[in-house]
């Protein structure tokens, strides 16, 4: 068996393109509902002319998203991982590497069991799933902070933490969709990008393991 399990996605779970579209559909509806609440009067009459408080929700959503994208910085979702916050060991023995990757696997596989099964079921998904998923990522990152890492694996460790925390932050924004649907909508776009980075990281880990004959 390999050090990194074949079924270990490194990022706990992945988001398909179809699931991502479903997420944006849900959040678009939230934005439209928000617009509706702010324009409860609908049509009104002034000097004999019928006026509407807002354009069609669909067009307004597009306009709002375009404007919000100018002010949304995806990098704000990404934390900076400092060496001082980590448990770094100078033991770079084969045994230390194996122990690290065994713990690495255990953290992620245990976390994957706690992801809500309804998260990417288009018929059952709800915003409450986002909060539950955010908590799963938070717990996983806490475990990684508590994990002792051999210095030779520090870059891998920091990248894993960065991506886990970024995904936690994305789900946190999504969980707040009732209060801030626009930011939640924009945050969803980052999910597929993060998963691509997780895939790259997994490939890098596999190369490292092969080169070090673990």
Where are these regions (language model features)?
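A loop-to-helix transmembrane entry motif
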Residues: 126-131
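Short, solvent-exposed, charged loop/turn and helix-capping segments
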Residues: 140-158
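Amphipathic alpha-helical packing segments from all-alpha helical-bundle domains
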Residues: 132-140
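Extended aliphatic helical segments
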Residues: 10, 15, 61, 135-136, ...
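C-terminal amphipathic alpha-helix
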Residues: 53-123, 156-214
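N-terminal Sec/ER secretory leader and immediately downstream segment
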Residues: 2-93
């Amino acid at each position: 068996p390999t050090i990194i399990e074949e079924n270990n996605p490194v990022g706990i779970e992945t988001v398909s393109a179809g699931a991502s579209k479903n997420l944006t559909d849900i959040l678009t509806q939230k934005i439209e509902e928000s617009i509706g609440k702010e324009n409860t009067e609908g049509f009104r009459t002034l000097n004999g002319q019928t006026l509407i408080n807002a354009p069609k929700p669909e067009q307004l959503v597009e306009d709002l998203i375009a404007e919000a994208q100018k002010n949304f910085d995806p990098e704000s979702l990404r934390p900076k991982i400092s060496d001082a916050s980590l448990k770094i060991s100078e033991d770079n023995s084969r045994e230390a590497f194996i122990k690290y990757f065994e713990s690495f696997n255990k953290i992620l596989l245990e976390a994957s069991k706690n992801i809500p099964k309804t998260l990417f079921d288009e018929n059952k998904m709800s915003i409450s799933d986002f909060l539950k998923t955010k908590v799963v990522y938070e717990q996983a990152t806490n475990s990684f902070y508590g994990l002792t890492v051999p210095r030779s694996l520090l870059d891998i460790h920091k990248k894993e933490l960065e991506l886990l925390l970024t995904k936690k932050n994305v789900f946190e924004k999504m969980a707040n969709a009732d209060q801030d649907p626009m930011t939640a909508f924009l945050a969803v776009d980052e999910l597929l990008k993060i998963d691509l980075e997780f895939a790259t990281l997994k490939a890098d880990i596999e190369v490292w393991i092969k080169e070090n004959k673990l």
